[in-house]
């Protein structure tokens, strides 16, 4: 094993990125601006990131020979999505470091582990029950009541892998509809709005957070993000401090997106994503340093940049041919005073 470890990457070093979609594309562009090369590993042909990266390997995540060659060709590996097979990580980790860490991935890939982790830190989530059988589903419904939401523990995103339960829902049919997988039932949260915080942590433990953004979703997909969010000063402080605590507890390196519900002035954590986040695209036009550069800085061992916001922002997300396009519009430029 020839594990490559380096606190600070030198100019011209290569950063490997798992996933070649839009986020991988933006990470590659940020890396290039900082003087780094990128190597994309992606199963699909001609992904967006391949157009701006130094190298591109098209292969499945179970193609261990190509994974090993990929990992041996780079100085560090990061990723644009969290549902990476464990076997792929095993191969890569023998060759070089992976940031963010596997612990962060492991927790974020499993909704049950994620909620237990958050609760252990002393923070609030929706009430929940583990569901591994039809009998456990019936018990969970009796305990949490309806409305409630039944979700797969793994591989769910953008509203996929979940179903809302009402008073007339049939547990037997619901159990069959989700494929009898490992599930989690979450109690209903009566919230006024949703927010997210994009935070980052460097190799030397420096933590920085962008201002919280207020998000609007439709059918489980992000539509708009508005900054500043509708929060009290204390809520804003709490959201940032909670994000910082999660980063510190995971010994995290890179950018993270933490999503919250605001319910009766209380912050309830929905989930976190161990990667650059769709609700953080506004930072490209609204901040001195955006989330993509911040992530590359962190995984490369550089100091974090200035995350200060220089204008109010409304980000509208449109979808064309199933690909997201963000238009970030400053809603008010700061005064010259």
Model-derived regions: residue spans:
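Protein kinase-like catalytic core scaffold
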Residues: 208, 267-271
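ATP-binding N-terminal substructure of ATP-dependent carboxylate-amine bond-forming enzymes
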Residues: 1-116, 135
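Internal nucleotide-binding/catalytic subdomain
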Residues: 165-258, 262
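A conserved helix-loop-beta module that forms one wall/lid of the active-site cleft
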Residues: 101-163, 168
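A short linear hydrophobic-aromatic micro-motif
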Residues: 127, 147-149, 182-186, 256-257, ...
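Conserved small/polar residues in nucleotide/adenosyl-binding loops
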Residues: 320-327, 337
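Active-site "cap" helix and flanking loop/linker of ATP-utilizing ligase/carboxylase catalytic domains
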Residues: 237-258, 263, 273-319
